Swiss-Prot record:
It catalyses: cholesterol + NADP(+) = 7-dehydrocholesterol + NADPH + H(+); 7-dehydrodesmosterol + NADPH + H(+) = desmosterol + NADP(+). Its EC number is 1.3.1.21. PANTHER family: 7-DEHYDROCHOLESTEROL REDUCTASE, DELTA(14)-STEROL REDUCTASE. Residues 1-20 are annotated as: Disordered. Pfam families: ERG4_ERG24. InterPro entries: ERG24_DHCR-like (IPR001171), Sterol_reductase_CS (IPR018083). NADP(+) binds at residues 356, 360, 393, 398, 405-406, 445, 449-453, 460. It is found in: Endoplasmic reticulum membrane. The chain crosses the membrane at residues 36-56, 97-117, 175-195, 264-284, 304-324, 329-349, 419-439. This is 7-dehydrocholesterol reductase. Catalyzes the last step of the cholesterol synthesis pathway, which transforms cholesta-5,7-dien-3beta-ol (7-dehydrocholesterol,7-DHC) into cholesterol by reducing the C7-C8 double bond of its sterol core. Can also metabolize cholesta-5,7,24-trien-3beta-ol (7-dehydrodemosterol, 7-DHD) to desmosterol, which is then metabolized by the Delta(24)-sterol reductase (DHCR24) to cholesterol. PROSITE patterns: STEROL_REDUCT_1 (PS01017), STEROL_REDUCT_2 (PS01018). Pathway: Steroid biosynthesis; cholesterol biosynthesis.
Amino acid sequence: MGERRRANASRGDKKVANGEKPHVGQWGRAWEVDYFSLAAVLFLLAFAPLIVYYFVMSCDQYQCALTAPVLDLYWGKAQLSDIWDKTPALTWGAAKIYIVWVSFQVFLYMLVPDILHKFVPGYEGGVQEGARTPAGLINKYQVNGLQAWTITHLLWFANAYHFHWFSPTIIIDNWVPLLWCANLLGYSVATFALLKAYFFPTNAHDCKFTGNFFYDYMMGIEFNPRIGKWFDFKLFFNGRPGIVAWTLINLSYAAKQQELYGQVTNSMILVNVLQAIYVVDFFWNESWYLKTIDICHDHFGWYLGWGDCVWLPYLYTLQGLYLVYNPVELSTATAVGVLLLGLIGYYIFRMTNHQKDLFRRTNGNCKIWGKKPKSIECSYTSADGKRHYSKLMISGFWGVARHLNYTGDLMGSLAYCLACGFDHLLPYFYFTYMTILLVHRCIRDEHRCSSKYGKDWKLYTDAVPYRLLPGLF
């Protein structure tokens, strides 16, 4: 939502002079916790780690059959202790792999400034500004995720085809021990962020304390916790180590399939290609990501810290893991259909975001679908008392639905799952989860915008009445 030029300030000042009270945008997460939110927080803190373990264990011990462990326990064929005894423990080898991995990503993030933006047309890297925080600050970020991803994968392929320092299957071979390492990092980061918010916050004005320990621990207190000038917890953990690892994990799955069966199935290739497109897109548009809900709304706590270390790399890659244990060779027609669904979904996702970015960068002085875009003008006041102005576009994809980028994202998510066939439920967890996540994100984002823009937001929703599916929702 592009910032309006300073010329518009006179109109806003006139409204104040006429006695019209400006709307103060209290965006960001809640100050107070209702019972439903607290119950959801307690549920996730208690069961999210068990859910991840259950999915990984189901593949490791039951060929990815989700109901098999429950049935074995029900019929007395196994005890919980039997399942636990078969679970690989944390090993020093896995710990070394994980320490080297995270340290290398910190090195690339902090000590290798981006140079790609200097010679890659259209890529925006280097020092970039984020969105305005609730306290009125605009933080600067070192955007070098695409460079880090490229260096990491060049080294991966150089090792696989030339140096042979380690096996390409190293990740899948240590998958469960690495789970314990990821949990240790996730909980450590979340706990550190909580303590930091109390004792040495980066910006105390962007902290929110509810008084409820569990809610604050999960949803975070600090908006943008940092160490030093550049190490931003949100940007690092949202992109690295989880999303950089995503494509490496899939490559390790493909290598394992080759090792076990002597070939890589077309379904595994589809999953690798479609998810790689999403990952590369994320890093290509990392500067745009600074203006999204993860950065603009979420505080940094267990939800982001543990989620990015554990939930993302372990549950977002379930399709590839499933195909290691259950190889699927799709017919040509089915493979083409899945590919088209994924590519069309990506096109909608990317073009929707591109239209918003173009609109923001040009302050609406551009063409969307061959016409000058229409918009609704909004104003809001940050916590420092300053009044700001924005435009909400109601043309192009943004005139079809308020979150059509999420619709495209869901189409891509479904394509990943369809590549695995219909024999098991496990691959479809991702689509189910993403549907719940994005619908919730729709509602949460709109609540934030309603709080931020007030009556102006109502004008926008009247102009664009549907969220995801025109005519339905």
